[in-house]
């Protein structure tokens, strides 16, 4: 009986604490938000687009994701058309799938042509930027020259990567090596928000491939040049990493965010703010020795 008398008082105390916490930081999401899609966790500040209040409010798009069943594969998590594979709060990153560009010979037309959805992307107006540390522009082929550049012609960024095979001899290729023989890869600058891929035409009938790919997830195989194994292995798409941050439109920093305590999102007592490596915005993380969600009250735990 003593427990029953105490329960209302405990509930009132917890509710009061939550109200006080909400008054000094960003509002916590409702407790009935969908936090899983297709077996993938959806941690706040991200949420499903049709559930109001379940994601952080930001003037740029990105925290609202979609949980859809496309092609009868069961529900998957998407940002627009990109299938999301993982969301990292600690590193301020998201992994998703992106198209691989295939450049193959068309016997009817008698020329090389791109025969798959291009490996292009435009993240303008979103919280995301292409990771310059996690991704590499990767090109596969013999007698292949592929380019990557921005789509807005503002930063005038262009890079080229070439792959060749001596006399077209695939037996000379080395599995695991991507140093220009059958495979080439190069870095991209930090903070890119868009890119496109194109090929230079050569007299060849082998398919060539190019994509911006998560470097740690790719290992070259000679079979990628003698067959469609590369495209088949990834279903026409390969993992890509994007950085994300809060307040990128306003160019906010941790200092400016702390100056507005009523909307400061790092609400866990054991959280800290980190200025984003993409140059604008910030994200929250748990202090060393703690794990969890820094965007939730008491979300960081030992």
Spans of features found by a protein language model:
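Typically disulfide-stabilized, N-glycosylated extracellular/lumenal ectodomains of secreted
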Residues: 2-302
């Amino acid at each position: 009986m003593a427990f029953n008398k105490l329960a209302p008082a405990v509930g009132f105390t917890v509710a009061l604490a939550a109200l006080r916490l909400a008054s000094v930081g960003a509002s916590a999401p409702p407790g009935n938000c969908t936090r899983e899609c297709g077996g993938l966790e959806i941690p706040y500040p991200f949420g499903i687009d049709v559930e109001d209040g379940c994601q952080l409010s930001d003037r740029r798009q990105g925290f609202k994701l979609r949980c859809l069943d496309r092609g009868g594969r069961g529900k998957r998590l998407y940002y627009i058309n990109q299938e999301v594979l993982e969301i990292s709060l600690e590193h301020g990153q998201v992994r998703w799938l992106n198209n691989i560009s295939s450049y193959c010979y068309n016997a009817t037309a008698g020329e090389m042509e791109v025969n798959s959805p291009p490996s292009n992307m435009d993240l303008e107006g979103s919280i995301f930027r292409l990771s310059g540390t996690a991704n590499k522009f990767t090109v596969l082929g013999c007698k292949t020259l592929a380019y990557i550049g921005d789509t807005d012609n503002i930063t005038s960024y262009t890079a080229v990567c070439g792959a060749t095979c001596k006399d077209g001899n695939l037996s000379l290729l080395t599995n695991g090596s991507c140093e220009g023989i059958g495979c080439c890869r190069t870095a991209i600058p930090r903070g890119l928000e868009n890119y496109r891929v194109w090929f230079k035409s050569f007299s060849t009938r082998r398919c060539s491939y190019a994509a911006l790919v998560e470097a740690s997830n790719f290992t070259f195989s000679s079979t990628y040049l003698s067959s469609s194994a590369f495209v088949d292995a990834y279903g026409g798409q390969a993992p890509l990493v994007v950085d994300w941050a809060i307040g990128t439109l306003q160019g906010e920093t941790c200092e400016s965010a702390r100056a507005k305590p009523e909307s400061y999102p790092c609400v866990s007592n054991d959280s800290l703010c980190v200025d984003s490596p993409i140059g604008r915005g910030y994200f929250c993380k748990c202090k060393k020795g703690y794990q969890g969600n820094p965007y939730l009250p008491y979300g960081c735990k030992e």
